[in-house]
């Protein structure tokens, strides 16, 4: 299969995985390894040097990223304005030594929907400052087009609100974005609940999936991480193989013409 391209970096896995909500740092590490992911998201807040737990998580993250030859993807979770997001992105670049940033600017506290106006403002500022921006957005076609026009090579529309596990609420919107932005790297982000959701996204032609809660909150996070890795592979292979068109009428898979009891109506 073709490698996932994120701003010139070739990755074997199309799964991006978060580092929050796990029962323990050890489970987090084992789940990330089981997933096969080479990109791990994290927030600056989780790396508080004054907290021993934060130090332990940071050590595990460094170990796993080194082991899989992967990349850290800092995010701007919790930011509500472009100014806040830009400030946090610059801090993250200095601390984590990466110009990748998962840009989140939340506009509503209830469903954690991104603020499109502030998101566009922050994107423009960060790109002008040399960042490689991976914006988290809704499944709004025009917003995705504007982000692409600003210079985002990677765009991350949601499947459904963060942490809901509702899966792909708007398949039509997501398919339209894929059709209208054929050259963008599209990664489905947020709302994924089960491996079949991720598989469906790949069957649509999406380039990857980013998730966290679906693995971290599973009864067995390590096994669920492995299941998601396999689901993405299955979906990608199905898309590349070419999925049959749906039909309005039934067609027998076994030809009945000239069989002993063939009937013609």
UniProtKB/Swiss-Prot annotation:
Places the protein is found: Cytoplasm
Cysteines engaged in disulfide bonds, as pairs: none
One GO molecular-function entry: thiazole synthase activity
SUPFAM superfamilies: ThiG-like
Stretches assigned to coiled coil: none
Domain of life: Bacteria
Pathway(s) this gene product operates in, as recorded in its UniProt entry: Cofactor biosynthesis; thiamine diphosphate biosynthesis
GO cellular component: cytoplasm
InterPro entries attached to this UniProt entry: Aldolase_TIM (IPR013785), Thiazole_synthase_ThiG (IPR033983), ThiG (IPR008867)
A Pfam family per the record: ThiG
Keyword tRNA processing found: no
PANTHER family found in the cross-reference section: THIAZOLE SYNTHASE
Quaternary context: Homotetramer. Forms heterodimers with either ThiH or ThiS.
Its job: Catalyzes the rearrangement of 1-deoxy-D-xylulose 5-phosphate (DXP) to produce the thiazole phosphate moiety of thiamine. Sulfur is provided by the thiocarboxylate moiety of the carrier protein ThiS. In vitro, sulfur can be provided by H(2)S.
Name the record gives this protein: Thiazole synthase
């Amino acid at each position: 299969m073709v490698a996932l391209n994120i701003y010139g970096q070739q990755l074997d896995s199309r799964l991006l995985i978060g580092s929050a909500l796990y029962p323990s740092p050890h489970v987090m590490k084992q789940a990330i390894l089981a997933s096969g992911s080479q990109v791990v998201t994290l927030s600056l807040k989780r790396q508080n040097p004054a907290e021993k737990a934060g130090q332990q998580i940071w050590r595990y993250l460094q170990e796993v990223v080194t082991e899989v030859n992967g990349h850290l993807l800092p995010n701007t979770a919790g930011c509500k304005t472009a100014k806040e997001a830009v400030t946090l992105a610059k801090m993250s670049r200095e601390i984590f030594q990466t110009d990748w940033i998962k840009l989140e600017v939340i506009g509503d506290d209830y469903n954690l929907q991104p603020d499109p106006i502030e998101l566009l403002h922050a994107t423009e500022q960060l790109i002008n400052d040399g960042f490689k921006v991976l914006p988290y957005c809704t499944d709004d076609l025009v917003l995705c087009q504007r982000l692409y026009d600003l210079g985002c090579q990677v765009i991350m529309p949601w499947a459904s609100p963060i942490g809901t596990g509702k899966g792909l609420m708007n398949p039509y919107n997501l398919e339209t974005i894929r059709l209208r932005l054929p050259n963008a790297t599209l990664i489905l982000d947020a709302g994924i609940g089960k491996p079949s959701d991720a598989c469906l996204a790949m069957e649509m032609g999406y380039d990857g999936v980013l998730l966290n809660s679906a693995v971290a909150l599973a009864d067995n996070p390590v096994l669920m991480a492995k299941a998601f890795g396999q689901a993405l592979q299955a979906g990608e292979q199905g898309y590349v193989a070419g999925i049959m068109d749906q039909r309005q009428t039934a067609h027998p898979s076994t030809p009945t013409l000239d069989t002993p009891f063939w009937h013609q109506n």
